[in-house]
């Protein structure tokens, strides 16, 4: 199963990390897309490490990040700088989507 996680707030980092780890432990793939305040998590080490985990793909809305002055320089190459197209792909490819 592919689990999509749509992150549009920076208030639930612990939940995001826990859900990702639980899904991976069950053998599921995880697709994440961040926008709005969710892009503020990009700079946190705990969040950034998730993209290096096998079975996890991550992207974020560049427009949201720029609008909130979120620094995207130095992000791991595994985190895709994208747009709402990446959100659409996640929603198409995921079997289930959680919004946090």
Question: What are the roles of these predicted feature ranges?
Answer:
Residues 47-71:
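A glycine-rich helix N-cap at a beta->alpha junction
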Residues 3-14, 35-41:
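Short, glycine-rich nucleotide/cofactor-binding loops
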Residues 1-2, 100:
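Absolute protein N-terminus
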Residues 70-100:
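C-terminal structural segments of small proteins and small subunits
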Residues 12-27, 32:
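Histidine-anchored nucleotide/phosphate-binding helix
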Residues 3, 29-30, 58:
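Hydrophobic anchor at the start of a short beta-strand
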Residues 18-19, 45-47:
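A short acidic, amphipathic alpha-helical/loop segment
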């Amino acid at each position: 199963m592919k689990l999509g996680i749509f992150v549009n707030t920076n208030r639930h980092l612990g939940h995001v990390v826990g859900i990702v780890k639980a899904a991976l432990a069950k053998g599921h793939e995880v697709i994440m897309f961040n926008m709005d305040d969710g892009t503020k998590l990009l700079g946190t080490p705990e969040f950034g490490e998730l993209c290096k985990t096998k079975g996890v793909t991550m992207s974020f809305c560049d427009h949201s990040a720029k609008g909130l002055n979120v620094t995207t320089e130095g992000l791991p190459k595994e985190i895709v700088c994208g747009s709402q197209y990446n959100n659409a792909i996640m929603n198409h490819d995921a079997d289930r989507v959680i919004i946090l």
